[in-house]
Amino acid sequence: MKRLTFLLFCLLLGIGMANAQTTKVTGTVISAEDNEPIIGASIVVKGTTIGTVTDFNGAFSLDVPSSAKTLVISFVGMKSQEVGVKSNLNILLESDNQVLEEVMVVAYGTTKKSSFTGAASTVRGEKIQKMQVSDISKSLEGSIAGVQTTSSSGTPGSSASIRIRGIGSISSSQEPLIVVDGVPYEGSLNSISTQDIESLTVLKDAAANSMYGARGSNGVIIVTTKGSKSGKAKINFEARYGFNARGVKPYDVITDAGEYYEMMYESYRNSLISSMGYAGASQYAAQNLISGNLKYNKFAGVADNALINPLTGKLNPSATSYKWSDDWSKDPFENGSRQEYNINIAGGTENTQAYASLGYLSDEGYVVGSEFERISARVKVDQKIGKYVKVGGNIAYANTIQSTFGDTNSNYSNLFMFSQNIAPIYPIYLYDTDGQLMYDEKGNVRYDFGTEYNRPYASEQNPLAVAKENIRKVLKDNLSSRGYLEANFLNDFKFTLNIAYDVFNTNQTDFSTPIGGDAASVGGRGYKYRPCSWMLWGLRQ
């Protein structure tokens, strides 16, 4: 009886202590503008995940720890508020006018977000600069509703294909119009450093794109670069270093050579049972699995006809060591380094402002043979002339070098597809029957293209060798210049004249090795492509 009384006392004491550790807080949240209750406002204990939301009457009830001192109340479009913990609270939330007063860039200049009636979305430069992308088109991925971006290549510096509000035509181009600092841009977006971006604005509907006519039928992406600033000159330097690695792992396929031999033996045996019977098919399949079917025996010290035990269908226990350790699922892929350095300076007086930047990017892909390098520079100057006139200029230069690893189509020269489909028994390099590497007359390691031992899969193909031996390099020099004149008079009347001159010079080299691959039958092939284009634009608003 005493023990029962003691246990009951401990239980009641524990309940009392538990109740003493929390405090119930109730209250209501209403709008300061119209005194209406706010439905779905968030009430959270500061520094924790303990919280609740208001009901249809704007009321809430929350058990908070006795150590809690502050509650954070927030709602979309309202200013967040912090209040002390009390048993009963009445909270007024005010509208956050800053959201509505945000200025956005549109086709005809700039406007307040609250007064804009078209369909447009903006990604700020601060968000873009947090993304580790070499091409600013990749920054739109998942950032804006109604914008779809796809990329058929994982090569650093490759641009994404952009679709705004779906496909508008089955025969014409689907790409949106790119406008940089008020003027259409025909160059590569990978030539623009993400550190020079002030904002990206996507215009989605016909009203927003009307200024550009038919060219804006697929939507418009307006790129605004960082502008000059008044005040004391400020220098900013940023250095980044990191690594690129394969994010999506290979599919679940057989990677163990012994398991692959056993499954192929079973398949080979089953195909012979109807004509030879089970015992005969088992014996024949084990005797001829290598010589008549797979051609390659990866295991050292085990004869081709003794690799599989026909009685059990299992691998010979003596098959414990490999003649080669090449791994198609790993060897073509390696972590690449990514380093980026940017420096800029901005400042000026009330009438004259300037901005200058210099950047370097080296981005090695995780696939052998893929790399992107960029050197960029930009100078921007704005000058007020009197009270009503303002002029400015913007000159940018970029030198880019992009190396790609090969084919992205669904064929044997696609490194991703090949490495996913080839069996784990086939090597990357060429070995003799004893497992020794073979070399050419110049002392270079030879690659296995499947012709030496009649490989049954993808004869004359080795995409890793092709990626290493082929040359696919694109060198570009882009020079973009922008100038404007802006006149303000008659109160709200503004006249703007934009002029631009762009030069795009490309030097592309493509060489396909004669030692194997698609060009082996013609002794290799190569070409150089050196187009140069220039654009002169003049726009007035």
Positions of the model-derived regions?
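Small-side-chain secondary-structure face that scaffolds active or pore-lining regions
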Residues: 314, 365-376, 382-384, 394-409, ...
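Short, small/polar-rich motifs associated with maturation and membrane association
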Residues: 1-378, 383-398, 412, 464, ...
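Short, flexible, mixed-charge acidic loops at enzyme active sites
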Residues: 235, 453-454, 512-516
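A ubiquitous, low-specificity "background" feature that marks scattered single residues
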Residues: 8-9, 37, 61, 187, ...
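Acidic/polar loop-and-plug regions of large Gram-negative outer-membrane beta-barrel proteins
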Residues: 313, 320, 398, 404-478, ...
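Short glycine-enriched loops at secondary-structure junctions
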Residues: 109, 450-452, 502-503
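Asparagine-centered polar/low-complexity signal
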Residues: 218, 462, 539-541
